[in-house]
Amino acid sequence: MAKEKPHVNIVFIGHVDHGKSTTIGRLLFDTANIPEQIIKKFEEMGEKGKSFKFAWVMDRLKEERERGITIDVAHTKFETPHRYITIIDAPGHRDFVKNMITGASQADAAVLIVAATDGVMPQTKEHAFLARTLGINHIIVGVNKMDAVKYDEKRFKEVATQVTKLLQMLGYKNFPVIPISAWEGDNVVKKSDKMPWYNGPTLIEALDQIPEPEKPTDKPLRIPIQDVYSIKGVGTVPVGRVETGVLKVGDVIIFEPASTIFHKPIQGEVKSIEMHHESMPEALPGDNIGFNVRGVGKNDIKRGDVAGHTTNPPTVVRPRDTFKAQIIVLNHPTAITIGYTPVLHAHTTQVAVRFEQLLAKLDPRTGNVVEENPQFIKTGDSAIVVLRPTKPMVIEPVKELPQLGRFAIRDMGQTVAAGMVISIQKGE
């Protein structure tokens, strides 16, 4: 049996109105992946005579978006010759940041859309920085709206230089910068004849070359629990996605912070593992599984617990401990000061955390310290802070286990900040 094509998750980022939705629309339109209900509507309206108009489709997508029905552009799939690609999100969704961090959807690559008319804008920088903070290591740049600058090579080069500077400063290397017009269909799926001066890949060709995501099988086992079920004849079945490591039948695993909270090890031997209703001897990173553990009951564990081997258990941060983190403030109405206690979302857990110290304010582009011990931090700032959880939780330093080292900070129904754990300080 031929090896299945690798699955790759991508996010679209970039400044508002630079053409993210149109680019996604064009990708789907030219690969014949427009949602069924839209095509049906088009045919019902007797619009057959007209050539199937891209503009009409984009209007429908936009209408549905404005009515609050996201045509799930989130989780839209299409194929390239060597990849299955899922567009897991596009900003503009309120929970974009939270989804990127806590979702079952860690993005493997980002497509940064920059309008040739405007060049790099504030959100271009913010989104690029966010992609970096969230550990998206592969980026593709689409310089859009080339039709609006008459397909001018000089203008493309100016914008390409701006973006390249920004991305190199953030540590990105080897990224394609592609001149496109999503509206006209140039260099998205079909090669453009209007820019003979460009001989690089189209957007879809660049997507086809996204490196296959590596499975972190050599890292310690971590399975954040999403739900816990009781199944007749089997017993308690925790369900979750293997983030790192390998789980085998017969392994002895422990759950945290459950063990810390109950002051006794919640642990046992793995009796069975199931995926898509089939039993399997082992599970690898990316697998969504249910598994049964001898001696672990339904009331012992819950969503937000993390399973690991007893030989290398998940790291617990208790209220007497603190952790140092680097954050970027995305959206706070006033300013964050010491004592602020919002809710931290990481993997499948949510715990209120208190800002204990503001150690330094950073230049978001270079990471250099611009101010020690600031009195406050506000929207747009990047900072090193010390946080203390109000109850025990599992979180890991991002250098060791990036999958469990990133978090979102939420308050008043919005994502206030995104960050990553630098180190953990154990209290006495």
UniProtKB/Swiss-Prot annotation:
Chain residue ranges for the region called G5: 181-183
Function: GTP hydrolase that promotes the GTP-dependent binding of aminoacyl-tRNA to the A-site of ribosomes during protein biosynthesis.
Residue ranges, annotated region (G2): 68-72
Region annotated G3, chain positions: 89-92
HAMAP family tied to this protein: EF_Tu_A (MF_00118_A)
Domain tr-type G, first and last residues per copy: 5-217
Protein name per its UniProtKB record: Elongation factor 1-alpha
SUPFAM superfamilies on file: EF-Tu/eEF-1alpha/eIF2-gamma C-terminal domain, P-loop containing nucleoside triphosphate hydrolases, Translation proteins
Family: Belongs to the TRAFAC class translation factor GTPase superfamily. Classic translation factor GTPase family. EF-Tu/EF-1A subfamily.
Keyword hit for Protein transport: no
Alphabetical list of Pfam families matching this protein: GTP-eEF1A_C (PF22594), GTP_EFTU (PF00009), GTP_EFTU_D2 (PF03144)
Enzyme Commission code(s) on record: 3.6.5.3
Predominant place of localization: cytoplasm
Catalytic activity: GTP + H2O = GDP + phosphate + H(+)
Protein source organism: Thermococcus sibiricus (strain DSM 12597 / MM 739)
Keyword Membrane applies: no
Residue ranges that the Swiss-Prot or TrEMBL entry lists as coiled coil: none
Regions crossing the membrane: none
Keywords of the record: Cytoplasm, Elongation factor, GTP-binding, Hydrolase, Magnesium, Metal-binding, Nucleotide-binding, Protein biosynthesis
GO terms of molecular function: GTP binding; GTPase activity; translation elongation factor activity
